[in-house]
């Protein structure tokens, strides 16, 4: 019994001691809050915080220890975060300790680089000089482009009758609606109203801008078509789907092809220097004169088309073809554009990447934008892609400047061409592959 009483008393003493420690700690916290003023210099910089005490201790208590434990805290921080910044807590504020080590920023993804370039070039033509350099516009339009294709990719495997329902709950689809409203209210709406006010003012000095937005405004025949919301939606749809995304993907494919087949790089640079030595005097004729580059674009597209199928149509009435095949109304038809362009009966050495193949052919249908029964990646006939001419000029202009002024390479772990991604029959370049890019020098190889 005496032993049991002794054990109970010991346990009671331990509990009292622990409670005393807790009370002392709470008193210190309270004292810190009462005595110490609010830190003058506080920062929300997202860097690691180095503490003398554990992370569960309130900041104010840690600040009390800085005067006596600063050396320990600073050295501990340096040991953990030698190559980057970290934060320490002082009584009067926060200190962000910077590193003197030179850190390299992560290499960009080629798709992101070209997406921004195409968006900026396209904006100059589509909405004029007012907005084409505006960073907020570029970000909003690029995000809108990305969300369109994320939404399309996510909805493709969904049955048609469920797509409207699923589309309403997709985060990318909801973001599209917010971005459209933001772009309309922040950029295009005010720009459209400003142009209409200037036009109706009767000012003889006012000249209509010569850009795509103005063409759409002039061609709008009904009040609904001319409403800023509808103009904005149509403009974004056309630029995002017909120009920005597809051109950025094609340029990414081309860059990957050049990285795994570098023997074609110098001939392209030589042609650029010969045809267009002065970038600032570039004309449409100069870009048309880049025959080797035009052939390279077409050969890259032959190996990496936007899709294996093209020439999509829906039969509007019962139809019997010349071979007797009956197509009832509503039948969805298409052509196997990908396999046709890799068919040995159509193309000599179809599995060999010959960058200047189409320069040698020198036929009317050899051009990048030409269409025919052996080249249907832009469609065929009356309804072939109307924006392919503009896209070709944009791609040649960007590629000319890029190849002339920059060297580029894969990361050390990337030896082969990144595998394309397949979304149904659609072919998309790997958009997550980092590319090291730097300004060209004549004496130092990359």
Swiss-Prot record:
Lineage top rank: taxon: Eukaryota
Annotated keywords: Glycoprotein, Heme, Iron, Membrane, Metal-binding, Monooxygenase, Oxidoreductase, Transmembrane, Transmembrane helix
GO molecular function list: heme binding; iron ion binding; monooxygenase activity; oxidoreductase activity, acting on paired donors, with incorporation or reduction of molecular oxygen
InterPro entries to which the protein is assigned, alphabetical: Cyt_P450, Cyt_P450_E_grp-IV, Cyt_P450_sf
Taxonomic source organism: Penicillium ochrochloron
Name of this chain's protein: Cytochrome P450 monooxygenase ptmP
Pathway(s) it belongs to: Secondary metabolite biosynthesis
Record flagged with keyword Glycoprotein: yes
Signal sequence coordinates: none
Keyword Repressor: no
Subcellular location: Membrane
Family matches, as Gene3D superfamilies: Cytochrome P450
GO CC annotation: membrane
One Pfam family linked to the record: p450
Gene name of this polypeptide: ptmP
Native organism taxonomy: Eukaryota, Fungi, Dikarya, Ascomycota, Pezizomycotina
């Amino acid at each position: 019994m005496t032993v049991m009483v002794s054990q109970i008393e010991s346990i009671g003493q331990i509990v009292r001691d622990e409670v005393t420690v807790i009370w002392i700690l709470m008193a210190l916290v309270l004292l810190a809050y009462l005595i110490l003023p609010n830190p003058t210099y506080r920062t929300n910089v997202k860097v690691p915080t180095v503490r003398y005490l554990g992370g569960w201790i309130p900041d104010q208590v840690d600040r009390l220890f800085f005067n006596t434990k600063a050396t320990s805290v600073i050295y501990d921080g340096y040991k953990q975060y030698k190559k980057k910044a970290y934060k320490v807590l002082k009584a009067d504020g926060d200190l962000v300790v910077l590193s003197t080590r030179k850190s390299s920023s992560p290499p960009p993804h080629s798709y992101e680089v070209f997406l921004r370039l195409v968006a900026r070039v396209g904006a100059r033509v589509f909405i004029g000089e007012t907005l084409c350099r505006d960073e907020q516009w570029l970000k909003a339009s690029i995000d809108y482009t990305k969300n369109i294709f994320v939404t399309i990719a996510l909805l493709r495997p969904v049955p048609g009758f469920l797509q409207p329902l699923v589309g309403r709950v997709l985060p990318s689809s909801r973001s599209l609606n917010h971005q459209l409203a933001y772009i309309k209210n922040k950029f295009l709406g005010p720009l459209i109203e400003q142009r209409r006010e200037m036009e109706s003012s009767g000012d003889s000095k006012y000249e209509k801008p010569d850009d795509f937005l103005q063409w759409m405004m002039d061609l709008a025949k009904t009040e609904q078509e001319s409403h800023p919301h509808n103009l904005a939606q149509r403009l974004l749809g056309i630029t995002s789907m017909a120009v920005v995304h597809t051109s950025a993907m094609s340029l990414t494919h081309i860059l990957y092809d050049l990285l795994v087949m570098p023997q074609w790089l110098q001939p392209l640079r030589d042609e650029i220097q010969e045809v267009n030595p002065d970038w600032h005097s570039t004309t449409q004729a100069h870009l048309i004169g880049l025959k080797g580059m035009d052939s390279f674009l077409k050969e890259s597209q032959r190996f990496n088309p936007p899709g294996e199928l093209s020439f999509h149509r829906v039969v509007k009435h019962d139809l019997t073809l010349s071979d007797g095949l009956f197509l009832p109304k509503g039948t969805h038809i298409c052509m196997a554009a990908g396999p046709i362009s890799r068919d040995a009966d159509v193309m000599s050495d179809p599995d060999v990447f010959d960058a200047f193949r189409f320069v040698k052919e020198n036929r009317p249908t050899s051009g990048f934008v030409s269409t025919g029964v052996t080249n249907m990646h832009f469609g065929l006939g009356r309804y072939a892609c109307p924006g392919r001419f503009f896209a070709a000029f944009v791609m040649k202009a960007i590629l000319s400047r890029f190849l002339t002024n920059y060297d580029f390479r894969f990361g050390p772990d990337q030896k082969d061409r990144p595998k394309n991604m397949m979304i149904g029959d659609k072919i998309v370049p790997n958009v997550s592959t980092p590319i090291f890019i730097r300004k060209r020098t004549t004496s130092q190889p990359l």
